[in-house]
Amino acid sequence: MVVNNRLGYLFVFLGMSMALYAQRKTEVIRYGDLDQWVVRKITESAIIGKETKTLYCVGPTDTIIGNRPFESKASPWGSSNVMARVSGITKASVSVYPERRDEGYCARLETGIESISAMGIMNVKVLVGGCLYLGRFLEPAKNSSETWGQIVCGIPFHQKPTSLLFDYKVKLSGDPNRIKLSGFSKRSEVNGIDMPLVNLFLQKRWEDKDGNIYAKRIGTLVIRMDKNTDWVNDANFTILYGDITKRSDYKEYMGFQLGESARYSLNSKGKNVPVQEIGWGTEDDEVTHMILEFCSSHGAHT
């Protein structure tokens, strides 16, 4: 995994196989070796330059030409590489790239500023982070302010792994503070460095008669990387089970994802709704879903 930040460059490189470990057995997540990619060719609208952009998706090797919404039936992976269509204007966003590593590939995740210019009149700048996750994006993107609401987060999953394994490399931007830049708003600073993150949440989900989705948090792994590293191979991170709030190493950001941070999922009516985490489960509870996210920034969307 590589992360890059184009502000001063923050990169995270994921070079896996990404795998889950349980009971002395290691199981690689499908396409988690990152050696196969779908290549998409998207032509942006004439008003913003009619440039053809290349988008990369983790999945069985293929090339797709044309501005069609993408959904991979074979791969469980989604990313921040998406096609957007706002007010009739088509735009492609690219922040995840395949990159050669040894005999195969890794993923390079970047954080940087994207500019959109129209006819030399409008110049919109947005801070974009690179993310690779289990789930899918509901293309085309319609705005930049409701990112989670456009993602189906997580996949059905019923195991209880003890840890997550992957290779990674980090290059931070070197800037002492993050920036806030969401389009037409003025650029501002947020205290503290930007850091790549990894989130793994094991949940027990259910749906009520009105289509609301609720969840208990069964397992938790939250990592924030605050230092530059060369390649770290076979890094092994322990998944914590049950209520972790009494642990000495507990941080508030490891808790329930609520409000603007709530993850979404499709209900039985086909509507993407918030997954409302309402309590802590135990290691004995059934697991129904896993959320797994690798992001180049913990604050690019702030």
Task: Label each region the model flagged.
Residues 23-161, 165, 180, 191-302:
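Aromatic (Trp/Tyr/Phe) and Gly/Pro-enriched flexible surface segments
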Residues 1-28:
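Bacterial Sec-dependent N-terminal signal peptides
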Residues 168-189:
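Short amphipathic, basic-aromatic surface patches that mediate peripheral association
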